[in-house]
Amino acid sequence: MAFVKISEQPSLYNDLEKKSVGEILHDINTEVEKAIPQIEKLVIEIVSRMRRGGRIFYMGAGTSGRLGVLDASEIPPTFGMDPSWVIGIIAGGDIALRNPVENAEDDTEQGWKDLQAFGINDRDTVIGIAASGTTPYVIGAIKTARAHGILTAAITSNPDAPISEAADIAIEMIVGPEYVTGSSRMKSGTGQKMICNMITTTVMIQMGRVKGNKMVNMQLSNAKLVDRGTRMVVEELGLPYDEAKRLLLLHGSVKEAVDAYRKQ
Protein backbone atom coordinates (compact mmCIF):
# COMPACT_ATOMS: atom_id res chain seq x y z
CA MET A 1 0.00 0.00 0.00
CA ALA A 2 1.44 3.38 -1.01
CA PHE A 3 2.38 5.84 1.73
CA VAL A 4 -0.09 8.74 1.73
CA LYS A 5 1.00 12.14 3.05
CA ILE A 6 -2.04 13.38 4.96
CA SER A 7 -0.33 16.73 5.46
CA GLU A 8 -0.33 17.32 1.69
CA GLN A 9 -3.91 16.29 0.95
CA PRO A 10 -6.41 19.00 -0.10
CA SER A 11 -7.31 21.32 2.76
CA LEU A 12 -10.47 20.61 4.72
CA TYR A 13 -11.15 24.34 4.60
CA ASN A 14 -12.32 26.41 1.64
CA ASP A 15 -12.95 30.08 0.80
CA LEU A 16 -10.14 31.09 3.13
CA GLU A 17 -10.09 34.63 1.74
CA LYS A 18 -13.69 35.09 2.93
CA LYS A 19 -13.01 34.17 6.55
CA SER A 20 -12.56 36.64 9.39
CA VAL A 21 -9.26 36.94 11.25
CA GLY A 22 -10.79 35.16 14.22
CA GLU A 23 -12.03 32.26 12.09
CA ILE A 24 -8.65 31.78 10.45
CA LEU A 25 -6.75 31.77 13.75
CA HIS A 26 -9.22 29.32 15.31
CA ASP A 27 -8.98 26.94 12.35
CA ILE A 28 -5.18 26.88 12.32
CA ASN A 29 -4.80 26.07 16.03
CA THR A 30 -3.67 22.48 16.63
CA GLU A 31 -3.51 20.24 19.68
CA VAL A 32 -0.44 18.11 20.32
CA GLU A 33 -1.73 16.45 23.48
CA LYS A 34 -1.83 12.96 21.95
CA ALA A 35 1.92 13.09 21.37
CA ILE A 36 2.80 13.69 25.04
CA PRO A 37 3.53 10.03 25.96
CA GLN A 38 6.17 9.80 23.24
CA ILE A 39 7.57 13.23 24.12
CA GLU A 40 7.86 12.13 27.76
CA LYS A 41 9.68 8.96 26.75
CA LEU A 42 12.14 10.98 24.67
CA VAL A 43 12.79 13.59 27.37
CA ILE A 44 13.62 10.91 29.95
CA GLU A 45 16.13 9.35 27.56
CA ILE A 46 17.67 12.72 26.67
CA VAL A 47 18.14 13.80 30.28
CA SER A 48 19.95 10.58 31.19
CA ARG A 49 22.35 11.21 28.31
CA MET A 50 22.83 14.94 28.89
CA ARG A 51 23.84 14.25 32.48
CA ARG A 52 26.74 12.30 30.98
CA GLY A 53 27.66 15.13 28.62
CA GLY A 54 25.33 14.31 25.74
CA ARG A 55 23.88 16.86 23.35
CA ILE A 56 20.71 17.34 21.32
CA PHE A 57 20.91 17.64 17.53
CA TYR A 58 17.91 18.80 15.52
CA MET A 59 17.96 17.81 11.84
CA GLY A 60 15.60 19.17 9.20
CA ALA A 61 15.15 20.73 5.77
CA GLY A 62 13.27 23.89 4.86
CA THR A 63 10.77 25.02 7.49
CA SER A 64 11.45 21.96 9.65
CA GLY A 65 15.16 22.71 9.67
CA ARG A 66 14.62 26.37 10.48
CA LEU A 67 12.42 25.48 13.45
CA GLY A 68 15.11 23.20 14.85
CA VAL A 69 17.73 25.91 14.50
CA LEU A 70 15.34 28.40 16.11
CA ASP A 71 14.70 26.22 19.14
CA ALA A 72 18.40 25.51 19.56
CA SER A 73 19.24 29.23 19.35
CA GLU A 74 16.84 30.01 22.19
CA ILE A 75 18.56 27.72 24.72
CA PRO A 76 21.61 29.90 25.58
CA PRO A 77 19.70 33.15 26.29
CA THR A 78 16.83 31.42 28.09
CA PHE A 79 18.70 28.86 30.16
CA GLY A 80 22.31 30.09 30.14
CA MET A 81 23.58 26.91 28.46
CA ASP A 82 26.51 26.89 26.08
CA PRO A 83 25.36 26.77 22.42
CA SER A 84 27.09 23.40 22.03
CA TRP A 85 24.45 21.62 24.15
CA VAL A 86 21.56 21.96 21.68
CA ILE A 87 22.47 22.25 18.00
CA GLY A 88 20.23 22.81 14.99
CA ILE A 89 21.35 21.57 11.58
CA ILE A 90 19.51 22.47 8.37
CA ALA A 91 19.98 20.81 4.99
CA GLY A 92 22.10 23.08 2.81
CA GLY A 93 23.82 24.79 5.73
CA ASP A 94 23.14 28.16 7.33
CA ILE A 95 22.51 29.84 3.98
CA ALA A 96 19.33 27.73 3.79
CA LEU A 97 17.93 29.62 6.78
CA ARG A 98 17.14 32.50 4.43
CA ASN A 99 17.38 31.06 0.94
CA PRO A 100 16.33 27.70 -0.53
CA VAL A 101 19.25 25.44 -1.45
CA GLU A 102 18.41 23.30 -4.47
CA ASN A 103 18.34 19.52 -3.89
CA ALA A 104 19.88 19.81 -0.40
CA GLU A 105 17.10 17.79 1.21
CA ASP A 106 17.48 14.96 -1.32
CA ASP A 107 21.01 13.99 -0.24
CA THR A 108 20.78 10.84 1.90
CA GLU A 109 24.42 10.97 3.06
CA GLN A 110 25.04 14.65 3.84
CA GLY A 111 23.07 14.63 7.09
CA TRP A 112 25.38 12.10 8.70
CA LYS A 113 28.43 14.01 7.41
CA ASP A 114 27.03 17.17 9.03
CA LEU A 115 26.64 15.31 12.33
CA GLN A 116 30.16 13.92 12.13
CA ALA A 117 31.50 17.47 11.89
CA PHE A 118 30.36 17.90 15.50
CA GLY A 119 32.01 14.70 16.69
CA ILE A 120 28.68 13.03 17.43
CA ASN A 121 28.77 10.09 19.85
CA ASP A 122 26.47 7.64 21.63
CA ARG A 123 25.69 10.07 24.47
CA ASP A 124 24.00 12.40 22.00
CA THR A 125 20.44 12.45 20.67
CA VAL A 126 19.40 13.16 17.08
CA ILE A 127 15.87 14.51 16.53
CA GLY A 128 14.78 14.50 12.91
CA ILE A 129 11.99 16.91 11.99
CA ALA A 130 10.04 16.30 8.77
CA ALA A 131 6.39 17.19 8.31
CA SER A 132 6.11 14.83 5.34
CA GLY A 133 8.08 12.12 7.09
CA THR A 134 9.97 11.37 3.88
CA THR A 135 12.87 13.87 3.72
CA PRO A 136 15.93 11.88 2.50
CA TYR A 137 18.48 14.18 4.19
CA VAL A 138 16.87 13.62 7.59
CA ILE A 139 16.05 9.94 7.20
CA GLY A 140 19.60 9.18 6.05
CA ALA A 141 21.03 10.89 9.12
CA ILE A 142 18.58 9.13 11.45
CA LYS A 143 19.30 5.68 10.03
CA THR A 144 23.06 6.06 10.22
CA ALA A 145 22.99 7.60 13.70
CA ARG A 146 20.81 4.76 14.97
CA ALA A 147 23.16 2.21 13.42
CA HIS A 148 25.96 3.80 15.47
CA GLY A 149 24.02 3.32 18.72
CA ILE A 150 22.89 6.94 18.96
CA LEU A 151 19.38 7.68 20.28
CA THR A 152 17.16 8.94 17.48
CA ALA A 153 13.70 10.50 17.41
CA ALA A 154 11.36 11.73 14.70
CA ILE A 155 8.80 14.54 14.67
CA THR A 156 6.36 14.19 11.78
CA SER A 157 2.81 15.03 10.76
CA ASN A 158 2.03 11.75 9.02
CA PRO A 159 1.24 8.36 10.60
CA ASP A 160 3.57 5.43 9.99
CA ALA A 161 5.91 7.64 7.97
CA PRO A 162 9.32 6.37 6.78
CA ILE A 163 11.06 8.65 9.29
CA SER A 164 9.03 7.07 12.11
CA GLU A 165 10.20 3.63 11.06
CA ALA A 166 13.81 4.85 10.95
CA ALA A 167 13.85 6.37 14.46
CA ASP A 168 13.90 4.85 17.95
CA ILE A 169 11.11 7.13 19.14
CA ALA A 170 8.45 8.50 16.79
CA ILE A 171 6.45 11.59 17.72
CA GLU A 172 3.58 11.68 15.26
CA MET A 173 1.50 14.82 15.45
CA ILE A 174 -1.37 14.10 13.09
CA VAL A 175 -2.71 17.56 12.29
CA GLY A 176 -4.42 16.48 9.08
CA PRO A 177 -4.37 18.40 5.79
CA GLU A 178 -2.87 21.86 5.98
CA TYR A 179 -5.10 24.92 6.04
CA VAL A 180 -3.48 26.02 2.79
CA THR A 181 -2.96 22.72 0.97
CA GLY A 182 0.60 21.45 1.28
CA SER A 183 1.87 24.48 3.24
CA SER A 184 3.57 22.60 6.07
CA ARG A 185 4.86 25.85 7.60
CA MET A 186 1.33 26.23 9.02
CA LYS A 187 -0.24 23.54 11.22
CA SER A 188 2.71 21.18 10.98
CA GLY A 189 5.23 23.95 11.60
CA THR A 190 3.30 25.37 14.54
CA GLY A 191 3.00 21.93 16.11
CA GLN A 192 6.68 21.16 15.48
CA LYS A 193 7.76 24.34 17.25
CA MET A 194 5.50 23.56 20.20
CA ILE A 195 6.93 20.05 20.49
CA CYS A 196 10.51 21.34 20.28
CA ASN A 197 9.68 23.83 23.02
CA MET A 198 8.18 21.07 25.16
CA ILE A 199 11.23 18.84 24.73
CA THR A 200 13.94 21.38 25.47
CA THR A 201 12.07 23.25 28.20
CA THR A 202 11.37 20.02 30.09
CA VAL A 203 14.95 18.85 29.60
CA MET A 204 16.35 22.15 30.88
CA ILE A 205 14.09 22.06 33.93
CA GLN A 206 15.25 18.52 34.67
CA MET A 207 18.85 19.69 34.24
CA GLY A 208 18.36 22.30 36.96
CA ARG A 209 18.33 25.38 34.74
CA VAL A 210 15.05 26.69 36.20
CA LYS A 211 14.13 27.40 39.82
CA GLY A 212 10.45 27.55 40.73
CA ASN A 213 9.19 29.04 37.48
CA LYS A 214 12.05 31.46 36.91
CA MET A 215 14.84 31.56 34.34
CA VAL A 216 17.55 31.94 36.97
CA ASN A 217 20.33 31.12 34.48
CA MET A 218 19.23 33.40 31.64
CA GLN A 219 21.84 35.50 29.88
CA LEU A 220 21.85 39.16 30.90
CA SER A 221 22.05 40.33 27.31
CA ASN A 222 19.95 43.51 27.47
CA ALA A 223 18.49 46.05 29.89
CA LYS A 224 15.15 44.26 30.07
CA LEU A 225 16.75 41.02 31.20
CA VAL A 226 19.03 42.78 33.68
CA ASP A 227 15.95 44.41 35.20
CA ARG A 228 14.08 41.10 35.27
CA GLY A 229 17.04 39.36 36.90
CA THR A 230 17.43 42.15 39.42
CA ARG A 231 13.80 41.84 40.45
CA MET A 232 14.27 38.09 40.88
CA VAL A 233 17.18 38.73 43.24
CA VAL A 234 15.13 41.32 45.14
CA GLU A 235 12.29 38.83 45.51
CA GLU A 236 14.58 36.00 46.58
CA LEU A 237 16.82 37.90 49.02
CA GLY A 238 14.81 40.97 50.02
CA LEU A 239 17.63 43.35 49.06
CA PRO A 240 17.19 46.92 47.80
CA TYR A 241 16.98 47.10 44.00
CA ASP A 242 20.38 48.78 43.48
CA GLU A 243 22.18 46.30 45.72
CA ALA A 244 20.46 43.38 43.99
CA LYS A 245 21.51 44.75 40.59
CA ARG A 246 25.12 45.18 41.70
CA LEU A 247 25.18 41.61 42.98
CA LEU A 248 23.60 40.28 39.80
CA LEU A 249 26.06 42.02 37.48
CA LEU A 250 28.98 40.93 39.65
CA HIS A 251 28.10 37.24 39.45
CA GLY A 252 26.47 37.09 36.00
CA SER A 253 23.26 35.21 36.77
CA VAL A 254 20.42 35.15 39.27
CA LYS A 255 21.42 31.71 40.53
CA GLU A 256 25.07 32.63 41.04
CA ALA A 257 24.16 35.93 42.69
CA VAL A 258 21.75 34.32 45.15
CA ASP A 259 24.11 31.44 45.94
CA ALA A 260 27.06 33.80 46.51
CA TYR A 261 25.05 36.05 48.83
CA ARG A 262 23.82 33.12 50.92
CA LYS A 263 27.36 31.79 51.33
CA GLN A 264 28.55 35.04 52.92
Place the predicted regions along the sequence by residue:
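A general structural signal for well-ordered alpha-helical segments in protein cores
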Residues: 21-25, 108, 192, 196, ...
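Glycine-rich phosphate-binding loops that contact phosphosugars or nucleotide phosphates
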Residues: 57-194, 203-207
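A short, well-structured juxtamembrane/interface segment
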Residues: 34-49
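Short, amphipathic alpha-helical interaction segments embedded in low-complexity terminal/linker regions
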Residues: 203-264
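Short glycine/serine/threonine/alanine-rich loop segments
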Residues: 54, 150, 239
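Gly-rich Lys/Arg/Thr-decorated short loops/hinges at beta-loop-alpha junctions or inter-strand turns
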Residues: 26-30, 88-99, 211, 226
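Charged, alpha-helix-enriched surfaces in structured cytosolic catalytic cores
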Residues: 37, 41, 136, 190, ...
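Cofactor-/ligand-binding subdomain signature composed of acidic, glycine-rich
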Residues: 1-31
